C-alpha cells in the first residue's frame, strides 16, 4: 500500500451537547479543542448536536407530530 494516502485514525472524544454524553472512540476527525478523559490523557474533542444518547428514536421519546392534518388526509384518501 502507498504511504501517506490514508487519513490518520486516532482516539477522539465525541460530546453530545444536548445530553452531556461523552464517548471515547476512534475516528479520522480531529479538532483543536481537547478534553482530559478519565484515564488522565488529553484527546481531541468533537462536539455534536445529537447522538444516540439524545435522539428521540433511540431514547424512546419518539412521537408523531401531525402538521396540518396530513395523517387524517392520508387515511381518508386510502381508507377501505
Swiss-Prot record:
Pfam families: Ribosomal_L31. GO terms for biological process: translation. This is Large ribosomal subunit protein bL31B. Belongs to the bacterial ribosomal protein bL31 family. Type B subfamily. The gene is rpmE2. PROSITE patterns: RIBOSOMAL_L31. GO terms for cellular component: ribonucleoprotein complex; ribosome. Transmembrane segments: none annotated. Keywords: Ribonucleoprotein, Ribosomal protein.
Amino acid at each position: 500500500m502507498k504511504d501517506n494516502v490514508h487519513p490518520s485514525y486516532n482516539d477522539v472524544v465525541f460530546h453530545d451537547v444536548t445530553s452531556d454524553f461523552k464517548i471515547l472512540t476512534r475516528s479520522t476527525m480531529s479538532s483543536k479543542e481537547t478534553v482530559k478523559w478519565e484515564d488522565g490523557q488529553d484527546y481531541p474533542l468533537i462536539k455534536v448536536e445529537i447522538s444516540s444518547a439524545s435522539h428521540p428514536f433511540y431514547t424512546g421519546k419518539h412521537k408523531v407530530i401531525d402538521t396540518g392534518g396530513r395523517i387524517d388526509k392520508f387515511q381518508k384518501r386510502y381508507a377501505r
